A protein has these predicted regions:
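A short, conserved alpha-helix within the catalytic core of class I
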Residues: 138-143, 185-202
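Intrinsically disordered, low-complexity regions enriched in glycine and serine
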Residues: 40-41, 149-163, 208-237, 297-306
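Conserved beta-strand signature within the Rossmann-like core of class I S-adenosyl-L-methionine
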Residues: 204-209, 236-250
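Short, conserved secondary-structure transition motifs
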Residues: 130-135, 247-256
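Short secondary-structure boundary/capping segments
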Residues: 67-68, 193-194, 257-263
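A short SAM/SAH-binding and catalytic strip from SAM-dependent methyltransferases
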Residues: 174-189
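Rossmann-like AdoMet
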Residues: 1-129, 136-151, 157-167, 171, ...
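Rossmann-like AdoMet/SAM-dependent catalytic core
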Residues: 255-374
Length: 374
């Protein structure tokens, strides 16, 4: 087996570990919300929301939908040009259009779906919205504009998209924010803004609430808490969590080479210094308001194994948190037999989870990396 093929095998298992861990946390979040619901004959089904930051071509919503496990609302945010391409693909593909709740594309004379130009998609269960995460209050601004039908720029309900009035983001519903290889591409202060904005959207009177958008600290001005967000205060508002996956340890020889290789391809990592290791990633979440209560060392060097802010590198996730049968299957499939380089690669990526309590809600009690073992 040549060296290039061996390297690809290690990367394949790394991708598998990342995919399995992030998907597992999303499923755990949705399961906890559903189990915490106390049904009665008159009560509606529990609401749960997922917001994917810098979603790109990710297919998480469609995988959840196919498995019958999609949340009440799934929101994807990315740059306008990325959103336009993805929206056109979804709206022009009958199966994808049906999954998100769009009408089927009109057939062309040749019988194939016609191309549909969209700048966004907004339905009752899915939203694909333009958003520059480098801007002030990026998440809350994108969601507010979707509720207002696109007023204020960034395009407004394009051809084939539904009315902004049908966009049913609920600031009091349990919400999970997912950031996979996103914050590392933002300057540290912009990454902090994203994490703080997500936290404040779940707070009482936060920027995700009805009629909000002003006075919620937009642009980092009045109304914003300074420095930390209270280290797990947030006792009111909605329950929520954030999952962050990014590279780390830029100061090691391997980390320096990794950054140099990416730089040679025109890809800078301006945000890698904001979370240099799992412990720093967990500390960053705490500083920006995400809960630190209930910490322990069980899930990795970031602590918080049974709840609060927890973080670990991908090696620890692979060794201690993923189900044994999943690891065995991946190892056999990819013929993993050289562990030294594999471990080195895995040590240079981290997964972090932050939690926000909300009122009397207990759905996310104990939610963290250790949820992968449940």
């Amino acid at each position: 087996m040549n060296v290039g093929k061996k390297s690809n095998l290690k990367k394949n298992i790394g991708y598998f570990c990342r995919h399995a861990a992030v998907s597992g946390l999303v499923l755990s979040f949705l399961s906890r919300v559903a189990k915490n619901h106390s049904p009665s004959p008159c009560s509606p089904p529990p609401r749960a929301q997922v917001v994917s930051l810098g979603a790109g071509s990710d297919t998480l919503f469609f995988r959840l939908h196919a498995a019958g496990k999609a949340p009440t609302l799934f929101v994807e945010l990315d740059l306008p040009e990325v959103v336009s391409r993805k929206a056109g693909t979804i709206a022009s593909t009958p199966e994808l259009a049906a999954a998100v709740g769009l009408p089927p594309p009109p057939p062309t004379l040749a019988g194939a779906p016609s191309s549909r130009k969209l700048d966004r998609i907004v339905t009752e269960r899915y939203a694909l919205l333009p958003c520059d995460l480098r801007s002030p209050s990026p998440i809350s601004t994108a969601i507010r504009r979707a509720r207002e039908g696109g007023e204020g720029g960034e395009g407004g309900g394009g051809e084939g998209s539904t009315s902004g009035a049908s966009f049913a983001f609920d600031p009091l519903a349990p919400t999970l924010f997912v950031s996979e290889c996103v914050l590392v591409y933002l300057p540290p202060e912009a990454g902090d803004e994203v994490l703080r904005d997500a936290f404040e959207m779940l707070s009482v009177g936060g920027k995700g609430g009805e009629g909000s958008g002003e006075g919620g600290g937009s642009g980092g001005g009045d109304g914003r808490r300074s420095g930390g967000g209270g280290g797990g205060g947030g006792g009111g508002g909605a329950e929520g969590a954030v999952v962050v996956f990014d590279p780390c340890r830029p100061e090691t020889a391997f980390g320096k080479q990794m950054a140099a290789n990416l730089r040679a391809r025109g890809c800078e990592l301006p945000g890698i210094g904001a979370a240099t290791d799992p412990g720093a990633a967990a500390a960053r979440l705490r500083r920006l308001g995400w809960e630190s209560r209930g910490e322990g060392r069980g899930a990795g060097e970031g602590g918080g194994g049974r709840g609060g802010c927890s973080a670990a590198d991908l090696r620890a996730v692979w060794d201690r948190l993923l189900p044994r049968e999943a690891r065995a299957h991946a190892s056999r499939r990819e013929q993993l037999d050289e562990l030294e380089e594999f471990n080195l690669i895995m040590e240079h990526y981290f997964l972090a989870v932050g939690v926000k309590r909300g009122g009397e809600g207990k759905a996310l009690e104990g939610f963290g990396l250790a949820s992968l073992t449940e």
